[in-house]
Swiss-Prot record:
The keyword Transmembrane helix does not apply. Belongs to the intron maturase 2 family. MatK subfamily. It is found in: Plastid, Chloroplast. Pfam families: Intron_maturas2, MatK_N. GO terms for cellular component: chloroplast. Keywords: Chloroplast, mRNA processing, Plastid, RNA-binding, tRNA processing. The gene is matK. Disulfide bonds: none annotated. This is Maturase K. InterPro entries: Domain_X, Maturase_MatK, Maturase_MatK_N. The keyword Isomerase does not apply.
Length: 513
């Protein structure tokens, strides 16, 4: 424990000060508004409330914050809602959203500066063609084939909000900012409860996405901080090189023994490290830890993670959140794919002079497929089909024009095919295409008070073309002269794209809450 405390103190020495005054600068809220516009996804299936940015309202908010007893009254009388002006619903919503997003931007500054000034790290060249979530799968395909055990780790949601604030004290000593953070969190939780309710967490996640991502990623960062500490203590290998990336999502080059990567704290994070015997990869709240060691070593690691989370995070980590399996006998769900490492047997004929003999060869291969059941469940939750996968109409879109309805359905279908292009079996994707196509037809028929058959006959080939991905058309032309397969009917070809920087909402059901 003494080593752990010294390790924590070394990290604490890089704290930043005085970010609170930035809350009184108007340009901070302009940045928050610009982020909200860039973060809007046109394919999003859940409702999105367009909030108009008003510099006049921002100035009024800043003037009110300058008042001497403004924060005191807001904290002492939260029910009166003096900050959010509860008498006017528009002001209440606007002030809550813009102030929390601006506050999240301010809190991100010391974290970014801390990573930029982190001493002792070598500069690693950046590869723009590896800024993709799909880049992790070639890495898994190369490394996981030689490993033995796999641990599935489910990182729990943040615990009591007060512990979140205490964790931030390791990186920020700006007391007014920490008090203001407590003030925000007071709206989403009951401070008398020992454990934060899931309802409060999802409310914060829905209404204040940037602040939620910052808090959650800060929490996960502390979790992985101790994982890195344990790795240093348990291995005699010297960490030859390490690196920190501030890109949104960046994949590290292959280094000799060790690599660290995580993006800005407010984005969805992809983080991994590697050494000759152990590999760790995480995206959001799910992580996998694979190693070459024995079963006893993996059980010790599980015990370490449970005990350290109890000691430092003051949270009882349920042992069942860390599942241990042999890699060759298990499937794991990660980044929207169901992956496994099966052993395939090949019969090879070898001929020497006049004699020939057969060789039974075994090979491991990382097999990635699109899981049909979770994806159909996501479509059902988004009201495109029933729980059994039967297509239904989308009544909320009947007010749109016919072209907008076709465009939305077609874009969702193209995004699903684009993200799951690395699937070795495409049957599930064709099933999703059928559901979306028929749901689109029923939506149009409902709008025009007609039947599905009438609209299928009326639209014809134009309706079908909307549901072919651009990638299928492009690749079928590119490889027409050099290959003998067609991407329109292929069920086994896998393609990894280098332009996917976020996980699709349908692939990640948590974003639909």
């Amino acid at each position: 424990m003494e080593k752990l405390e010294r390790y924590s103190e070394k990290r604490k020495s890089r704290q930043q000060y005085f970010v609170y005054p930035l809350l009184f600068q108007e340009y901070i809220y302009a940045f928050a508004h610009d982020y909200a516009l860039k973060g809007f996804e046109p394919v999003e299936i859940v409702g999105y409330n367009n909030k108009k940015f008003s510099s006049l309202l921002v100035k009024r908010l800043i003037i009110r914050m300058y008042q001497q007893n403004f924060w005191i009254n807001s904290v002492n009388h939260p029910n009166q809602d003096r900050l959010l002006d509860h008498s006017n619903h528009f002001y209440s919503k606007f002030y809550s959203q813009i102030l929390s997003e601006g506050f999240a931007i301010v809190l991100e500054i010391p974290f970014s500066l801390g990573e930029l000034s982190c001493p002792g790290e070598k500069e690693i060249p950046k590869f723009q063609n590896l800024q993709s979530i799909h880049s992790i799968f070639p890495f898994l395909e190369e490394k996981f084939l030689h490993l033995h055990y796999l641990s599935h780790i489910e990182i729990p949601y943040p615990i009591h909000f007060e512990i979140l604030v205490q964790l931030l004290e390791y990186r920020i000593q700006d007391v007014p900012s920490l008090h203001l953070l407590r003030f925000f969190l007071n709206y989403y939780s009951n401070w008398n409860s020992l454990i934060t309710s899931m309802k409060s967490i999802f409310l914060l996640k829905k209404e204040n996405k940037r602040l939620f991502r910052f808090l959650y990623n800060s929490y996960v960062s502390e979790y992985e901080f101790f994982l890195l500490f344990l790795r240093k203590q348990s291995s005699s290998l010297r960490l030859i090189s390490s690196g920190t990336f501030l890109e949104r999502i960046h994949f590290s080059m292959k280094m000799e023994h060790f690599g660290v990567m995580y993006p800005r704290f407010f984005q969805k994070t992809l983080w991994f490290f590697m050494d000759p015997l152990m590999h760790y990869v995480r995206y959001q709240g799910k992580a996998i830890l694979a190693s070459k060691g024995t079963l006893l070593l993996k059980k010790k690691w599980k015990s370490y993670l449970v005990n350290f989370s109890q000691y430092f995070l003051s949270f009882w980590t349920q042992p069942q959140r860390i599942r241990l399996n042999q890699l060759r006998n298990s499937c794991f769900d990660f980044l929207g794919y169901r992956s496994s490492v099966p052993i395939n047997t090949f019969l090879v004929r070898n001929q020497m002079l006049e004699n020939f003999f057969l060789i039974d060869t075994r090979m491991k291969k990382l097999d990635t497929t699109a899981p049909a059941t979770p994806l159909i469940g996501s479509l059902s939750k988004a009201q495109f089909c029933t729980g059994l996968g039967h297509p239904i109409s989308k009544p909320i879109w009947t007010d749109l024009s016919d072209w907008d309805i076709l465009d939305r359905f077609g874009r969702i279908c193209r995004n699903l095919f684009h993200y799951h292009s690395g699937s070795s079996k495409k049957q599930a994707l064709y099933q999703l295409k059928y559901i979306l196509r028929l749901s689109c037809a029923r939506t149009l028929a409902r709008k025009h008070k007609s039947t599905v058959r009438t609209f299928m006959q009326r639209l014809g080939s134009v309706f079908l073309e909307e549901f072919f991905t651009e990638e299928e058309q492009v690749f079928s032309l590119m490889f027409a002269k050099t290959t003998h397969f067609s991407f329109h009917g292929s069920h086994s070809e896998r393609i990894w794209y280098f332009d996917i920087i976020r996980i699709d909402d349908l692939v990640n059901p948590l974003t639909l809450n």
